[in-house]
C-alpha cells in the first residue's frame, strides 16, 4: 500500500540533513510468499524464472533474466535518486534449494557473480561514486585453524564475496558475523586479510543479547567491538531496534565509551 509520499526520497532527505549516507537496500533473490501479491506479479512477468521453495518464491540465480532484471531495478534507483550506495541482501543461492547438495559450486559462484557484475556495471556506469555493498554470510570460508561448521559464504551458498572485492564489483562488505568467541575473532581477521584494500564492516548480532534470544552478556559484544577497532575494521549492528532500545546497555556503551567523537566515512581511494 502506498504511504502517499515517496518513502525513499524522504529517507534520503532526512539522512543527508543529518550528515548521514543513504544506501538503498535491495533484497535480491527472495520475492516473498508464493501466493503473495509481489510474487504473483513477478510470476506473470517471468513465469519460468521464479522457483518455489517451501511455499516461498525465489529468483532463479542461474538465468541471465535474473541478472538483467535486478540490474535494471538497481539502475533505476540509482538514476532517479541521490543515493550514496546500493546494498544487496540475499545475493546468494537459497540455502533451502535441494540442488545445492549436488550441483557444481564453481558453477554456482559463477552464476551469482554474473548477477553481481551486471548490477555493479549498471550502477557504476551511471554514477561511479555510488558505493556497491552486500551482506555476505558471516564466514567467508574455513581458516587454517578453524572450521566454519559447514556454514560459509564461499562454499555453502556460492558467494565469492572476496573475488567481488578483488575485481572491483564491490566497494564494501558487511558480513553477517552473528557469532561469538572462536566463531567470530579468527573469521573477522580472515575478512580483513582478504579485503584487497576495500572496506569491511562486520555486522554484530546484538539481538542475541535479548532474553528472548540467547541472552548474551554485553561483554560479548564489547569484546568484539574492541577487537574490530584494534584491527582497523568497522562495525555494524543487527538490528537497530536492539541498539535504540539500549539492550543490555549497548547504546550507552557506544555513546559514552566507544564513539565519543564523530568519525569520517572512509573514502573510496580506488575510484
For the regions a language model picked out, list residue spans one by one.
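Conserved, mostly hydrophobic/aromatic
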Residues: 15, 70, 77, 86-89, ...
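Aromatic-lined carbohydrate-recognition surfaces of secreted/lumenal glycan-active proteins
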Residues: 12, 16-35, 87-88, 108-154, ...
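Aromatic- and acidic-residue-enriched segments that line the glycan-binding/catalytic groove
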Residues: 30-54, 91-106, 145-152
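Short, acidic/polar
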Residues: 64-80, 150-167, 184-188, 215-227
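The substrate-binding groove and active-site-proximal loops of carbohydrate-active enzymes
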Residues: 1-5, 53-71, 101-111, 170-180, ...
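Active-site-adjacent "subsite" loops/lids of carbohydrate-active enzymes
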Residues: 1-13, 17, 23-80
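Substrate-binding cleft of secreted/luminal carbohydrate-active enzymes
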Residues: 161-184, 198-270
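Substrate-binding cleft/loops of secretory-pathway carbohydrate-active enzymes
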Residues: 126, 131-174, 179-190, 211
Amino acid at each position: 500500500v502506498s504511504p502517499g509520499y515517496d518513502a525513499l526520497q524522504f529517507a534520503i532527505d532526512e539522512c543527508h540533513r543529518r550528515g548521514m549516507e543513504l544506501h538503498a537496500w535491495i533484497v535480491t533473490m527472495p520475492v516473498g510468499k508464493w501466493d503473495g501479491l509481489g510474487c504473483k506479479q513477478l510470476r506473470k512477468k517471468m513465469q519460468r524464472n521464479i522457483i518455489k521453495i517451501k511455499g516461498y518464491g525465489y529468483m532463479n540465480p542461474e538465468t541471465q533474466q535474473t541478472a538483467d532484471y535486478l540490474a535494471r531495478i538497481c539502475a533505476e534507483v540509482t538514476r532517479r535518486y541521490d543515493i550514496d550506495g546500493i546494498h544487496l541482501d540475499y545475493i546468494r543461492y537459497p540455502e533451502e534449494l535441494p540442488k545445492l547438495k549436488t550441483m557444481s559450486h564453481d558453477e554456482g559462484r559463477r552464476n551469482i557473480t554474473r548477477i553481481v557484475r551486471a548490477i555493479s556495471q549498471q550502477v557504476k556506469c551511471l554514477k561511479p561514486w555510488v558505493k556497491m555493498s552486500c551482506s555476505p554470510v558471516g564466514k567467508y570460508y574455513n581458516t587454517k585453524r578453524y572450521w566454519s561448521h559447514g556454514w560459509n559464504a564461499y562454499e555453502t551458498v556460492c558467494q565469492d564475496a572476496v573475488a567481488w572485492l578483488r575485481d572491483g564489483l564491490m566497494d564494501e562488505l558487511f558480513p553477517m558475523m552473528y557469532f561469538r568467541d572462536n566463531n567470530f575473532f579468527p573469521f573477522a581477521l580472515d575478512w580483513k586479510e582478504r579485503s584487497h584494500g576495500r572496506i569491511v564492516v562486520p555486522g554484530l548480532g546484538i539481538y542475541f543479547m535479548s532474553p528472548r534470544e540467547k541472552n548474551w552478556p554485553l561483554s560479548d559484544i564489547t569484546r568484539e567491538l574492541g577487537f574490530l577497532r584494534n584491527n582497523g575494521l568497522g562495525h555494524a549492528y543487527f538490528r537497530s531496534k536492539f541498539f535504540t532500545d539500549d539492550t543490555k546497555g549497548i547504546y550507552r556503551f557506544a555513546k559514552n565509551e566507544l564513539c565519543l567523537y564523530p568519525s569520517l566515512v572512509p573514502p573510496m581511494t580506488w575510484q
